[in-house]
Regions:
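Extracytoplasmic/secretory soluble proteins
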Residues: 1-225
Length: 225
């Protein structure tokens, strides 16, 4: 989220849904952002950060199903049919009525899409959902020198509550690499895998080759096209 806005508003980092709602309203009123919280169609799926505080399904998987089975109080049930998910949707409806969510959220591109990125970097969005490593890329793409993004905790109904996020479906995560026993040079293969976690590898993966697909201006990477 926009840490610089939170500081300028004199507000604390939100921990509960009520605190987050109060912050979003303040961002909308103070900065005129039409998308105080950026949500796409995944907002009503189960791979988002908002649902978990209601005990509703939250599964960190890019190819998660629209619903999945869960066990609640010893009863097997479809995750999106529990009472918590209904509360979650009721809250989203209220936020939609308050003008905090884009009127066209069902057709909104993801936060990794160029259009979604522009919502975040242009000052039209206060809170969004994406991986922490993406914050540096959003900052580099923004023309706002004051933009400062910070991580926010998953909101809960009451302070002190814990959220439960399912990551057990995939033993090695959604994206993984493995080295076959047939590999002729496993040490070189490991070096290749490690490369993508270096500064040079991250730069190459996100912007491509400097001088070809991007240029570095004042310490910030910019696409040439």
């Amino acid at each position: 989220g926009r840490g610089d806005w939170i500081e300028a508003l004199g507000m604390d980092v939100p921990e509960t849904y009520d605190e987050l709602h109060e912050l979003l309203m303040a961002m909308k009123n103070q900065y005129g952002c039409t998308t105080a919280i950026y949500l796409d169609s995944a907002a009503v799926g189960n791979d988002n950060f908002l649902a978990a505080g209601y005990g509703a399904p939250c599964m960190l998987a890019t190819n998660a199903k629209e619903s999945y089975w869960m066990v609640q109080d010893g009863t097997v049930m479809d995750g999106i049919t529990n009472e918590g998910y209904k509360e979650y949707l009721t809250m989203l409806h209220q936020w939609y009525e308050d003008g905090l969510i884009s009127r066209d959220f069902a057709n909104a591109p993801g936060a990794m899409d160029p259009s979604g990125m522009s919502e975040i970097t242009s000052g039209n969005c206060g809170v969004f959902f994406n991986g922490a490593p993406m914050m540096s890329m959003y900052s580099a793409m923004s023309d706002d020198p004051n933009l400062r993004l910070i991580g926010l905790p998953d909101p809960v109904k009451t302070k002190g509550e814990k959220t439960h996020v399912d990551t057990t479906e995939y033993d090695f995560g959604v994206e993984r690499m493995s080295i076959s026993t047939k590999c002729s040079d496993p040490e070189l293969a490991i070096q290749y895998c490690d490369f993508w976690f270096t500064d040079q590898g991250i730069q190459l993966a996100n912007y491509g080759v400097e001088g070809l697909s991007c240029e570095v201006v004042d310490g910030k990477s910019q696409f040439t096209d």
